[in-house]
Amino acid sequence: MAEDELAEIRRRKMAEMQQHAAMQQQDMERQQQYEAQMQMALMQILEPEARERLNTIKLTKPDFARAVEQQLVMLAQSGRIKNKISDDQLKVILQQVTPAKREFNIRRKG
């Protein structure tokens, strides 16, 4: 009887692991599909130079670049972007979106 119970536990554990692996695979496929849709949308929104600039930013600040991409796609979907965005226009957008930097001055008494 103990062997039967042990075999049942192993079978359940194996099924659970397979289900978990299948869910991870589905999540990964969904993420890849989302990324492909995002890139297609950006190709329609941005001129090549602007896309290149955004890809360069993505290398150094991936979270910031992703946020900008999402905002651009949302603007395009809402109809607020009529023409392709040029590199100069993207620079302006990036300056507006970039949080203000604080400067610290350290003064030494002596």
UniProtKB/Swiss-Prot annotation:
Keywords on record: DNA-binding
SUPFAM superfamilies assigned: Double-stranded DNA-binding domain
InterPro entries: DNA_bind_arc (IPR022889), PDCD5-like (IPR002836), PDCD5-like_sf (IPR036883)
Pfam families in the record: dsDNA_bind
Any one GO CC term of the record: cytosol
Superkingdom of this protein's organism: Archaea
Listed HAMAP family: dsDNA_bind
Family: Belongs to the PDCD5 family.
Protein name in the entry: DNA-binding protein Mhun_3016
